Amino acid sequence: MVSVNPRPKGFPVFDSSNMSLPSSDGFGSIPATGRTSTVSFSEDPTTKIRKPYTIKKSRENWTDQEHDKFLEALHLFDRDWKKIEAFVGSKTVVQIRSHAQKYFLKVQKSGANEHLPPPRPKRKASHPYPIKAPKNVAYTSLPSSSTLPLLEPGYLYSSDSKSLMGNQAVCASTSSSWNHESTNLPKPVIEVEEPGVSATAPLPNNRCRQEDTERVRAVTKPNNEESCEKPHRVMPNFAEVYSFIGSVFDPNTSGHLQRLKQMDPINMETVLLLMQNLSVNLTSPEFAEQRRLISSYSAKALK
């Protein structure tokens, strides 16, 4: 059991201050108060002690001649450090760039009108972030897609402003949506001053609509037939193209030139291009065996 009394009876008490240690020679004693030992446990013995930093190589100074060459090279080559290194001759690229950085900071702080080469453009990202469309953009109102006729596959309508207005005015089935959406347009401001009318006064809606319809009529009169009845084809009709090329080798078929003139321009260009490639391939030495085979067929047909 543990005794509650801090000093049990009969237990000797030792006082360290009165104790003496034997001297090194065995004749005297050294008092304990004369020797103090302090141990600091705050430092971690496992931490690695950093070695003192010593400068092994002295910093190379730039002479006035080297600095003048550096300034001249800046005017000639801007930030092409390799060419500046070759021009200076006695400094490396690392030393030149370090010197240039210090020189640029010094010029910017002093505000002197010295020549500083423009910074190099940053590399463009291979996958740039998508640019969001600005919120405050005035979109021109066009007729709804339900009022326009469906386009045939393989055709493309011209996208310039005049033909677009012509297609809208002639090909639209009804004009109700056009009149409805034209009211949402911003009111234009008068550019030419008229007597009795303010220069910044907006025009009435009826007048704007009347002028727009007159412009549409004036634009759509000459190209009504071209815009709606005869659109331009984007892709050639390969069925017609290969049918014509096959008929060229048919001895019972004639009138190839007339048929070629009646084709669409893109079909005609495709036929001519394929026939030209065919003639080049047949004249090349790689197809000598095929030519010999074709000539044997023609000889059999003549017999």
From Swiss-Prot:
Main location: nucleus
InterPro entries, alphabetized: Homeodomain-like_sf, Myb_dom, Myb_dom_plants, SANT/Myb, SANT_dom
Places the protein is found: Nucleus
SMART domains named in the record: SANT
Pfam families: Myb_DNA-binding, RVE6
Residue ranges occupied by any HTH myb-type domain in the UniProt entry: 54-108
Database matches in Gene3D superfamilies: Homeodomain-like
Domain of life: Eukaryota
A single GO cellular-component term on record: nucleus
Region (Disordered): 109-130
Function recorded in the entry: Probable transcription factor.
Official protein name in the record: Protein REVEILLE 5
Natural source organism: Arabidopsis thaliana
Gene name for this UniProt entry: RVE5
